[in-house]
From Swiss-Prot:
GO MF term set: antigen binding
Biological processes per GO annotation: immunoglobulin mediated immune response
Protein name: Ig heavy chain V region
Organism of this sequence: Mus musculus (Mouse)
Keyword terms of this UniProt record: Adaptive immunity, Immunity, Immunoglobulin
SMART domains (UniProt xref): IG (SM00409), IGv (SM00406)
Protein's UniProt keywords contain Repeat: no
Further remark: Antibody isolated from ten mice was exclusively of the IgG1 subclass. There was no heterogeneity in the heavy chain V region sequence.
Domain of life: Eukaryota
Source taxonomy: Eukaryota, Metazoa, Chordata, Craniata, Vertebrata
InterPro entries: Ig-like_dom, Ig-like_dom_sf, Ig-like_fold, Ig_sub, Ig_V-set, IgHV
Zinc listed as a keyword: no
Domain Ig-like residue range list: 1-106
């Protein structure tokens, strides 16, 4: 069973940056797509981007280009998402979700409140 464990809640100031982690257990980072999404209060899910084992570069949602950085450390089965130049509207719960290639989402993190 795929399980994702995210880092804890963050209290940050406007203009600063936040970096959160997502550690996977139950499978190894060999063939996957790891997504980051967020949910602001009263809003639906919003995609930030994803990283794939089949590509050398992450894919970022256009809205967050230049502010978001997604990386993965395959040696520790951990993915990271950093969001910079934070604004009040970035207040949300941030989730990671993994899809093993050719399957639906196999696991979700519990969320990180920012």
């Amino acid at each position: 069973e795929v399980q994702l464990q995210q880092s804890g809640a963050e209290l940050v100031k406007a203009g600063s940056s936040v970096k959160m982690s997502c550690k996977a257990t139950g499978y190894t980072f060999s063939s996957y797509e790891l997504y980051w999404v967020r949910q602001a209060p009263g809003q639906g899910l919003e995609d930030l981007g994803y990283i794939s084992s089949s590509s050398a570069y992450p894919n970022y949602a256009q809205k967050f280009q230049g502010r978001v950085t997604i990386t993965a450390d395959e040696s520790t089965n951990t993915a990271y998402m950093e969001l910079s130049s934070l604004r009040s509207e970035d207040t949300a719960v941030y989730f990671c979700a993994v899809r093993v290639i050719s399957r639906y989402f196999d696991g979700w993190g519990q969320g990180t409140l920012v």
